[in-house]
Swiss-Prot record:
InterPro entries: PsdUridine_s_RsuA/RluB/E/F_cat, PsdUridine_synth_cat_dom_sf, PsdUridine_synth_RsuA/RluA, PsdUridine_synth_RsuA/RluB/E/F, PsdUridine_synth_RsuA/RluB_CS, RsuA_PseudoU_synthase, TruA/RsuA/RluB/E/F_N. This is Ribosomal large subunit pseudouridine synthase E. Gene3D superfamilies: Alpha-L RNA-binding motif, Pseudouridine synthase I, catalytic domain, N-terminal subdomain. It comes from Pseudomonas aeruginosa (strain ATCC 15692 / DSM 22644 / CIP 104116 / JCM 14847 / LMG 12228 / 1C / PRS 101 / PAO1). It is an enzyme of class 5 (isomerase). Its EC number is 5.4.99.20. GO terms for molecular function: 23S rRNA pseudouridine(2457) synthase activity; RNA binding.
Length: 189
């Protein structure tokens, strides 16, 4: 029997800092969502690795969570990716066509060069080496495999240095400071 939706469904947008776990408890004492979000009964709709930053959605509505997180719904997820090296047209083409990873081929991604975005300082900062150029890409994917963006850029010879998710479907980081959250209408049209 399907569980009824909560009487007051909630959907939170959270700008997750680097080195924060996307869970509410950690026996090792690392930083978690409980350090930022005082709202009881919500849980992440999807994942964002500890070493990634940016948009994380949380909800108390299991049906909404399933629609957001389930790859069958193919909600586009937009990432700004700082990579080591200078991307060429061949590398971008490979990302756009999909790359083969150890767990199989990815779906095609939208990939483009991006001017360096204005972002908050990362703590700790990304390692800087004067002799190694870095560039930013915008990648839009419609799957959610473990560490997928990092593995895709590595597969085309562009190791990821910094990864920031800026959009999931209709929701974005617009105006949300690092470590901040806000509630939005809990629906996916």
């Amino acid at each position: 029997m399907a569980k009824a939706p909560p009487s007051e469904p909630k959907l939170l947008l959270f700008n997750k800092p680097f080195d924060v776990l996307t869970q509410f408890n950690d026996e090792q004492g690392r930083s978690t969502l409980k350090d930022f979000i005082p709202v009881p009964g919500v849980y992440p709709a999807g994942r964002l690795d500890r070493d990634s930053e940016g948009l994380l959605l949380l909800t108390n509505d299991g049906r909404l969570q399933a629609r957001i997180a389930d790859p069958r719904h193919k909600l586009p997820k937009t990432y700004w990716v700082q990579v080591e090296g200078t991307p060429d047209e061949e590398q971008l083409r490979r990302l756009r066509e999909g790359v083969t990873l150890n767990d199989g081929p990815t779906l095609p991604a939208e990939a483009r060069l991006l001017d360096e975005p204005t972002l908050w300082e990362r703590v700790p900062p990304v390692r800087f080496r004067k002799s190694v150029p870095t560039h930013w890409l915008e990648l839009v994917i419609r799957e959610g495999r473990n560490r997928q963006v990092r593995r895709m850029t590595a597969a085309v010879g562009l190791p990821t240095l910094r990864l920031v998710r800026v959009r999931i479907g209709p929701w974005s980081l617009d105006g949300l400071g690092l470590g901040e959250w806000r509630e939005v209408p809990a629906r996916l049209d």
